[in-house]
């Protein structure tokens, strides 16, 4: 009789443990799904912010380019204009990465292309902000 109780209690403990493991697995998979959904949301928000930032920079660069194109230019203005044109090309290549990588990277393997595109994204942010700051500073100086 004691043996029956021992077997019954062992069976209850084993089934409780199995349910506990199953619940843990389900909660982990639910957590993974929630984590993945939140990552997708963050990526979506980041993509929207990047798109808005690119649009704003393009608009600002076009406005500055029109300003410099309409009047007489000094050598410094000409240099700023050249930089703005380069920035516009880089921003356009971010919008159409397939075309840009085809044009600029013929003969490279896929890893080199990915590295080049990542470097281009990193290379744009610093100089664009500096260039816009310098151009706006120059405009404010001329106006004031």
From Swiss-Prot:
Among InterPro entries, the record links this protein to: Bombinin
Which positions carry the signal peptide feature in this UniProt record?
1-18
User: Where are the Isoleucine amide residues found in this chain?
Assistant: 143
Any Pfam family matching the protein: Bombinin
- Record propeptide residues: 19-43, 74-123
Tell me which residues bear Serine amide.
Answer: 70
Q: Where in the cell is it found?
A: Secreted
Single Gene Ontology BP annotation: defense response to bacterium
Q: Keywords in alphabetical order, please.
A: Amidation, Amphibian defense peptide, Antibiotic, Antimicrobial, Cleavage on pair of basic residues, Cytolysis, Fungicide, Hemolysis, Secreted, Signal
Keyword Secreted among UniProt keywords: yes
Which Gene Ontology cellular component annotation is one that this UniProt entry carries?
extracellular region
| Tissue specificity as recorded in UniProt | Expressed by the skin glands.
Indicate the family of this protein.
Belongs to the bombinin family.
What the protein does? Maximin-10 shows antimicrobial activity against bacteria and against the fungus C.albicans. It has little hemolytic activity. Maximin-H3 shows antibacterial activity against both Gram-positive and Gram-negative bacteria. It also shows antimicrobial activity against the fungus C.albicans. Shows strong hemolytic activity.
Which protein are we looking at? Maximins 10/H3
Say which species the protein is native to.
Bombina maxima (Giant fire-bellied toad)
Taxonomy, top ranks, is: Eukaryota, Metazoa, Chordata, Craniata, Vertebrata
């Amino acid at each position: 009789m004691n043996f029956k109780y021992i077997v019954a209690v062992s069976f209850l403990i084993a089934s409780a443990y199995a349910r506990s493991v199953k619940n843990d697995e389900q909660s982990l998979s639910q957590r993974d799904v929630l984590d993945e959904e939140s990552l997708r949301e963050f990526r979506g928000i980041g993509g929207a912010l990047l798109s808005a930032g690119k649009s704003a920079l393009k608009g600002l660069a076009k406005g500055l380019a029109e300003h410099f194109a309409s009047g007489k230019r000094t050598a410094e203005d000409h240099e700023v204009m050249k930089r703005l044109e380069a920035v516009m090309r880089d921003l356009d290549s971010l919008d159409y990465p397939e075309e840009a990588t085809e044009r600029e990277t013929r003969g490279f393997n896929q890893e080199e292309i990915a590295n080049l595109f990542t470097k281009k994204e990193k290379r744009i942010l610093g100089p664009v902000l500096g260039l816009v700051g310098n151009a706006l500073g120059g405009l404010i100086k001329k106006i004031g």
